[in-house]
A protein has these predicted regions:
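Active-site and ligand/interface coordination hotspots across diverse enzymes
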Residues: 1-99, 119-121, 164, 168, ...
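Beta-strand-turn-beta hairpins that frame and shape the catalytic cleft
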Residues: 40-44, 127-133, 219-229
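Short, solvent-exposed loop/turn segments at secondary-structure junctions
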Residues: 49-54, 139-143, 182-186, 233-237
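Short, contiguous, well-structured surface segments enriched in hydrophobic/aromatic residues
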Residues: 83-86, 91, 126-139, 143
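Short mixed-charge
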Residues: 93-129, 196-223
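Proline-aspartate-enriched helix->loop->beta-strand connector
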Residues: 165-183
């Protein structure tokens, strides 16, 4: 894996994305290729549902890669989704660096949006995990703030879409994939489930208005040297009890397999 190869593959797949989804399409993939190559001890990829565009993005393809890496340059984080992705990814990377899990309370300074109860890691040289990971959307076209799960699943069932997604995974070559888009079949396919060890972890999240039992599934494929975690979408945490248990569960799972990478 080298820079020239990653740039060429990303550019090639960008053209496939533009052909498959017309108009306002999100060109996603690796956040920052130089950073991705610099820190390849554990390569992390998040699978989300679909992008939500600002008015300036309508009508033409745009770089989703810039969108999520720019979140680290803003004052605080621009969205709950990217903030939570950053914190969990940072925790997984620290497992590899330190050889042990960083507890939620020992993370770098956490700040809050004004009027927002969701925690967000403040930006510093140490805490720029969005530069070091990849983020992919199941559907590359603009969606609503609340996705239609049936539409997302139907998108995955299109052969052309699945081909593009797996071409992206092939060149990104992640070791830890977090499927956070309600498409369980994607997690099974990525893990090549018949060749994988399979486990689950259940937790009851207690939100302000309801309790919800969330089952996190995870697969480890020794042949691919790949951990696939099927988890809740990070932006949903305000409904079911907050970030700490989500962070703890996902990072604990990753830490159990980190010695393989």
């Amino acid at each position: 894996m080298n820079k020239e190869f990653l740039i060429a593959e990303q550019n090639r797949i960008d053209e496939l994305i533009k052909k498959q989804w017309a108009g306002s399409v999100a060109l996603d993939g690796i956040g920052d290729i130089d950073s991705y190559l610099k820190y390849d001890d554990v390569r992390i990829c998040w699978f989300l549902k679909e992008p939500v565009l600002s008015y300036k993005d309508y009508g033409t393809p745009y770089s989703y890669r810039t969108r999520f890496t720019d979140a680290a340059d803003a004052k605080g984080w621009r969205s709950t989704t990217f903030g939570h992705i950053a914190i969990v990814s940072y925790g997984i990377m620290k497992c590899k660096i330190d050889g042990s899990m960083t507890e939620f309370g020992d993370l770098p300074k956490i700040s809050l949006y004004k009027g927002d109860s969701s925690p967000h890691m403040e930006d510093s040289e140490e805490t720029r995990p969005l530069d070091f990971i990849s983020v992919l959307n199941m559907k590359k076209q603009n969606g609503a703030s609340k996705s239609n799960n049936a539409e997302i699943i139907a998108e995955y069932n299109k052969k052309e879409v699945k081909d593009i997604l797996f071409q992206q995974i092939k060149y990104i070559n992640p070791q830890v994939i977090i499927v956070a888009n309600r498409v369980e079949k994607l997690a099974e396919d990525l893990a090549e489930v018949k060749l994988s060890n399979f486990e689950t972890k259940s937790r009851v999240y207690e939100g302000k208005k309801k309790k919800e039992t969330v089952v996190t599934k995870f697969y480890f494929n020794t042949e691919l040297n790949r951990l696939v975690i099927y988890a809740r979408h990070p932006s949903m945490l305000s409904l079911v009890g907050g970030l700490k248990p989500y962070y703890t569960d996902l990072v604990n799972i990753a830490n159990s397999f980190i010695h393989h990478f």
